[in-house]
Amino acid sequence: MNNLLLVALGGSIGAVFRYLISIFMIQVFGSSFPFGTLLVNVLGSFLMGVIYALGQMSHISPELKALIGIGLLGALTTFSTFSNETLLLLQEGDWLKATLNVVLNLSLCLFMVYLGQQLVFSRI
């Protein structure tokens, strides 16, 4: 299958997952903090680490990288939404939540990419 179609398919799946996860997190935790965006970014970062590590070991096809790594995870995770939500918190004067949002997204996402890679590398 054409890689462009795989990216589009993965992107549509990732966007739907992001929407459903965000709605679920608002229902569970309310909307005072962007937990949905945090969760999709952390989960997506972990999966990106796994995909990257598998790709480094040639255990994943270029087609699967396009479908999952670029399409699904590209649509699932969202830096633009993270940035907008952080700016809204700042504009509301909630510096603590804005700072927490930045620190949690960056530190947890970096850690999850690392964890995903280590999980794969330790199994081989």
Swiss-Prot record:
Membrane topology reported for the UniProt record: Multi-pass membrane protein
Gene Ontology molecular function terms on file: fluoride channel activity; metal ion binding
Main location class: membrane
InterPro entries: FluC
Catalytic activity: fluoride(in) = fluoride(out)
Residues that, per the record, bind Na(+): 74, 77
UniProt entry tagged with the keyword Transport: yes
One Pfam family cited in the UniProt record for this chain: CRCB
Superkingdom, natural source: Bacteria
Residues spanning the membrane: 4-24, 35-55, 60-80, 102-122
Activity regulation summary: Na(+) is not transported, but it plays an essential structural role and its presence is essential for fluoride channel function.
KW Disulfide bond (keyword) present: no
GO biological process: cellular detoxification of fluoride
Compartment(s) of residence: Cell inner membrane
Family per record: Belongs to the fluoride channel Fluc/FEX (TC 1.A.43) family.
Protein role: Fluoride-specific ion channel. Important for reducing fluoride concentration in the cell, thus reducing its toxicity.
Record protein name field: Fluoride-specific ion channel FluC
